């Protein structure tokens, strides 16, 4: 999977990380950091689903 979640050090917040760049994922040019657990989990699932769909459509 391209996108993963990482807990921010010393905080109860999360970031969604792009495994290609090893930086926070960008949505509308906004780094996806300081998210609560549920939001980070949902966003990670969504971004990975969109990435899979883009990869599949690029092959056809």
Where do the PLM segments sit?
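Low-complexity intrinsically disordered segments
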Residues: 55-60
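A short, exposed loop/beta-hairpin motif centered on an aromatic-Gly-Thr core
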Residues: 23-39
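Short N-terminal "domain-start" leader segments
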Residues: 1-23, 41-53
């Amino acid at each position: 999977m391209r996108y993963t979640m990482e807990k921010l050090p010393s905080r109860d917040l999360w970031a969604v990380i792009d495994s290609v760049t090893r930086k926070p994922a960008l949505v509308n040019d906004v780094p996806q950091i300081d998210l609560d657990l549920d939001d980070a989990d949902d966003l990670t699932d969504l971004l990975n689903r969109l990435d899979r769909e883009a990869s599949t459509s690029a092959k056809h």
